[in-house]
Amino acid sequence: MSTKYIFVTGGVVSSIGKGIVAASLGRLLKNRGLKVTIQKFDPYINIDPGTMSPYQHGEVFVTDDGAETDLDLGHYERFIDINLNKYSNVTTGKIYSEVLRKERKGEYLGATVQVIPHITDALKDKIKRAARTTDSDVIITEVGGTVGDIESLPFLEALRQMKADVGADNVMYIHTTLLPYLKAAGEMKTKPTQHSVKELRGLGIQPNMLVIRTEQPVGQNIKNKLAQFCDVAPEAVIESLDVEHLYQIPLNLQAQKMDQIVCDHLKLDVPVADMTEWSAMVEKVMNLKKQVHIALVGKYVELPDAYISVVEALKHAGYANNAEVKIDWIDANRVTAENVAELLGSADGIIVPGGFGQRGTEGKIQAIRYAREQDVPMLGICLGMQLTCVEFARHVLELADANSAELNPDTPYPIIDLMRDQIDVEDLGGTLRLGLYPSKLKHGSKAAAAYDHQEVVQRRHRHRYEFNNDFREQFEAAGFVFSGVSPDNRLVEIVEIPENKFFVACQYHPELSSRPNRPEGLYTAFITAAVEKSSER
């Protein structure tokens, strides 16, 4: 069977939910027995989002092979339950860098290097390579931004050319737009969608399907009007209504036969998607019996997208405990020794996620100290793990000026230090310890119990600093347990205090491996402990 290519574009406004639509379609096609992969095209000129501010971009999602990517890849993995790779996120910066590198090597044999064909050919190669490396039946490619953006033009031209390259029966274009509702007029307005499609058609792409984002149900008259003016079949105008839970969306799209229309267009003769297990999960999610309050003490809490995988992993762990997770967003900059009890006193659990830089770290340390001394379940992630060690050094080992060398290079007690292979690294981008690495678990520890007593787990990392092993014996003598280490025993991966209900922190990012139907072990154990604390109130 020829590989099938589905392209998802957006119009009218950005952040319209293209990624969720693409991920939902991927889940439906996977449940039809097709092997699906998915990728995101980001038209910005950065090589990757690794050095971008979370306020600009949100979370950086890390793949198994160490690519720093767009947060939409997290949605893709969670919805479709697949592990993506470096070919799943392509930026303008990455493409231009590769083309210019080839030009410097003389690989274009003296030709004038141009957007067409050199940039568009490089983009098409990324699409085909993503499908080829995963041996997929279907590849879904989402283009970031909106039609009409200057940055998107080479990407859309590459998508247009794909139809001629692989054949019309193997390509489908899906356009996602906003259908605004004017309260004063009491009606929905189709004109923005019409203009968006007109713009897309002006670039040579005729959409085969429209997905309409809306707050209000769309009547058949509106669908017929859009079908007429945008030249698509009325049944191919799909409503994407706002929902209470994201995981309802695949079921809503299936109810409108979206996946069947896609299969018919691409001439895919495959069974109907069996969504029984997914439906049962959604039913459970919408009828959770308990509630638990988790304080998330972070640096970027004004933008929840900066912690989107953390939030989803907490929710998944809540599902496993039949509990709705309510998140209290605590700005780490506000936390002091004087107000920590007031800010965190109502929390059933405290999570301290990753981050970079000095700002907010002292507040996080106060939150960690409160969790340790008051025996509140606590989970530290990445920088949260490093600060857990710093807090213990300061307040238990009484090393008053202990710190991380990242935060204070002159500290007399560098509990956290630069990794040896990072000493001579000058570039910030793409140089962290990235991707999947193993952690050997200590028998009888809470970490081992969280992972069903496995000897080794593999999780994704994104860091440059590590625990300084010169202090390991001193920590262990005071009851601090290093419950996860690298197989060569050089790198500390997980730490815990066994006397507490749940006081565990890890260097890696467990949230990147969580799925709604298969929650991550440490998160599940953390929420279990938080639910128990909640029941004691």
From Swiss-Prot:
Residues 1-268 are annotated as: Amidoligase domain. One of its GO terms (cellular component) is cytosol. Pfam families: CTP_synth_N, GATase. CTP binds at S14, D149, I150, E151, K189, T190, K191, P192, T193, Q194, K225. One of its GO terms (biological process) is pyrimidine nucleobase biosynthetic process. GO terms for molecular function: ATP binding; CTP synthase activity; glutaminase activity; identical protein binding; metal ion binding. Pathway: Pyrimidine metabolism; CTP biosynthesis via de novo pathway; CTP from UDP: step 2/2. ATP binds at S15, I16, G17, K18, G19, I20, D72. The active site is at C382, H509, E511. It is an enzyme of class 6 (ligase). Its EC number is 6.3.4.2. InterPro entries: Class_I_gatase-like (IPR029062), CTP_synthase (IPR004468), CTP_synthase_N (IPR017456), GATASE (IPR017926), GATase1_CTP_Synthase (IPR033828), P-loop_NTPase (IPR027417). It comes from the Bacteria. Residues 293-536 form the Glutamine amidotransferase type-1 domain. NCBIfam families: PRK05380.1, PyrG. Catalyzes the ATP-dependent amination of UTP to CTP with either L-glutamine or ammonia as the source of nitrogen. Regulates intracellular CTP levels through interactions with the four ribonucleotide triphosphates. Belongs to the CTP synthase family. CTPSs have evolved a hybrid strategy for distinguishing between UTP and CTP. The overlapping regions of the product feedback inhibitory and substrate sites recognize a common feature in both compounds, the triphosphate moiety. To differentiate isosteric substrate and product pyrimidine rings, an additional pocket far from the expected kinase/ligase catalytic site, specifically recognizes the cytosine and ribose portions of the product inhibitor. This is CTP synthase. It comes from Streptococcus gordonii (strain Challis / ATCC 35105 / BCRC 15272 / CH1 / DL1 / V288).
